[in-house]
């Protein structure tokens, strides 16, 4: 059995740096464990696979948020936190048949090609996806802008091949609208462009002289702390926003402040059990400032923060160790301490590690506790999978007919699906399936069943949207009525 010399050095360094007080050399022990795994495991495993498995086990067992990710997985994480990337614009999950599309992004190459939520990807350019992880399939789909990839798709109606031209996918994590004298703002997550998108919404809100904001943070999993802080600085009055407290002396504790004097905004914030992490930082800052109330359910309670560290390959670790006589395993150590910028080929993947926790303005630590709402009310339900709060009322005054394309078509399909008239996946094109659903809706509402969206049909659809919200989203309606009462 081949000795795993460089793996021993790398993993031994990791272990001894974590538990130096024990005064023990775990290198030989770990080397024996790796050799045992390679020898006894029923599938062949090369040195790099063994190392990655060891790192995944080492960091993945620390807590639910820490772990090791190879370069493909790292790319997926980075894409999810960026405002734009080159790809097709679809989120994937593993399923029995292969990999399933769980979300097609609006106005993306995937949507334009006709891909739908729920499509099962059986093959990429003729290569089966069976047994593969979503990250591996995503890597196969990814490519240069302007090139094409052919996906073999399984639907209930049968199998088909769909060619998709890769392109720039821009994800806007902020959506908003005006309802009378209230601005509704939904923040999906805190990606690299969240604060910029939020500022664009605030510019228009300020231009209209609106000071009442219904902020929807439900199901927001968090993201970049800096982005959540940047949003808070636009609406939370001066004072502490949050404090990050780290154990390691290599990371400096940090306090974030707002210098906004005399904030004019009255805030109602919608939260639920999936409001987490950076979203809780924003919600906690609003609650502690006294400028807003939380409405809904207790939040998730993720009060710890993670840092991402790029990890060297064993070869790079040995190369730089020999050259400099130093033994750092992460790129940030080489850059911070020695000014050495590593090549991408030197990197094995990333370690995401829980490094500290945060406190709210009033000193609350919410890890495992969450934020209790000021007004507790049942969370929304999603009729036929539709989030009613995210539907915009129809505004297009022109009659929409077969093959019409645009946002109003998508909003109408969402209303029709929530109301049980439409079984398809809402998109931006009116096809025969859309028109058939409209005819059913028109007939039940005593409107001429043309299948087109005229003024009368538009008004009835908007009325149905209001009725659906009243039935299925009490938190939204409570927040709206509360703000309108002032």
Predicted features and spans:
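Conserved acidic, small-residue-rich alpha-beta core segments centered on
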Residues: 207-214, 220-385
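A short glycine-leucine-enriched loop at secondary-structure breakpoints
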Residues: 109-120, 142-144, 285, 418, ...
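Short acidic, glycine/serine/threonine-rich helix-capping segments at coil-helix boundaries
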Residues: 399-465
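Conserved PDZ fold ligand-binding element
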Residues: 110-132, 213-216, 437-447
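Sec-dependent N-terminal signal peptides of Gram-positive bacterial secreted proteins and lipoproteins
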Residues: 1-23
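Extended, small/polar residue-biased N-terminal targeting/export presequences
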Residues: 40-100, 148-164, 173, 473-477, ...
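C-terminal, low-ordered peptide segments at domain boundaries
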Residues: 122-210, 253, 367-398, 465, ...
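PDZ/PDZ-like domain micro-motif
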Residues: 25, 106-119, 172-173, 408, ...
């Amino acid at each position: 059995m081949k000795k795993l010399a460089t793996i021993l050095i790398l993993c031994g360094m990791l272990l001894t740096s974590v538990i130096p007080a024990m005064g023990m050399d775990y290198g030989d022990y770990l080397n024996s464990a790796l050799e045992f795994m390679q020898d006894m495991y029923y599938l062949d495993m090369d040195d790099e696979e063994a190392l990655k498995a060891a790192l995944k086990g080492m960091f993945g067992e620390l807590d639910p948020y820490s772990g090791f990710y190879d370069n493909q997985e790292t790319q997926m994480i980075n894409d999810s936190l960026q405002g734009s990337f080159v790809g097709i614009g679809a989120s994937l999950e593993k399923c029995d048949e292969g990999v399933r599309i769980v979300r097609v992004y609006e106005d993306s190459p995937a949507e334009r090609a006709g891909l739908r939520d729920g499509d099962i990807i059986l093959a990429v350019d003729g290569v089966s996806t069976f047994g593969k992880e979503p990250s591996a399939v995503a890597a196969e789909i990814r490519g240069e802008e302007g090139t094409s990839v052919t996906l073999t798709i399984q639907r209930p109606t049968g199998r088909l091949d769909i060619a998709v031209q890769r392109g720039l996918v821009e994800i806007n994590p902020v959506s908003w609208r005006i309802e009378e004298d209230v601005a509704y703002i939904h923040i999906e997550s805190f990606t690299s462009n969240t604060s910029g998108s939020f500022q664009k919404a605030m510019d228009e809100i300020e231009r209209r002289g609106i000071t009442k904001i219904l902020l929807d943070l439900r199901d927001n999993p968090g993201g970049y702390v800096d982005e959540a802080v940047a949003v808070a600085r636009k609406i939370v009055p001066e004072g502490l926003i949050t404090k990050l407290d780290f154990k390691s002396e290599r990371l400096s504790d940090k306090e974030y402040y707002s210098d906004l004097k005399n904030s004019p905004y009255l805030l109602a914030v919608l939260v639920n059990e999936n409001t987490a992490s950076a979203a809780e930082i924003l919600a906690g800052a609003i609650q502690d400032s006294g400028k807003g109330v939380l409405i809904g359910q207790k939040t998730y309670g993720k009060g710890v923060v993670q840092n991402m560290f790029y990890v060297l390959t064993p070869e790079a670790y040995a190369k730089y160790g020999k050259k400099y006589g130093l033994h750092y395993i992460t790129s940030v150590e080489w850059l911070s301490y020695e000014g050495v910028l590593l090549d991408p080929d030197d990197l094995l993947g990333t370690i995401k590690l829980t490094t500290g926790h945060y406190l709210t303005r009033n000193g609350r630590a919410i890890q495992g506790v969450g934020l209790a709402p000021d007004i507790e009310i049942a969370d929304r339900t999603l009729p036929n999978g539709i989030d009613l709060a995210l539907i915009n009322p129809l505004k297009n005054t022109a009659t929409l007919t077969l093959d019409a394309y645009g946002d109003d078509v998508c909003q109408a399909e969402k209303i029709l699906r929530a109301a049980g008239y439409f079984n398809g996946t809402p998109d931006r094109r009116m096809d025969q399936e859309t028109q058939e659903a409209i005819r059913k809706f028109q007939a039940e509402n005593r409107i001429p069943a043309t299948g087109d969206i005229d003024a009368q049909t538009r008004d009835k659809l908007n009325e149905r949207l209001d009725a659906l919200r009243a039935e299925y989203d009490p938190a939204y309606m409570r927040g709206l009525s509360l703000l309108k009462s002032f």
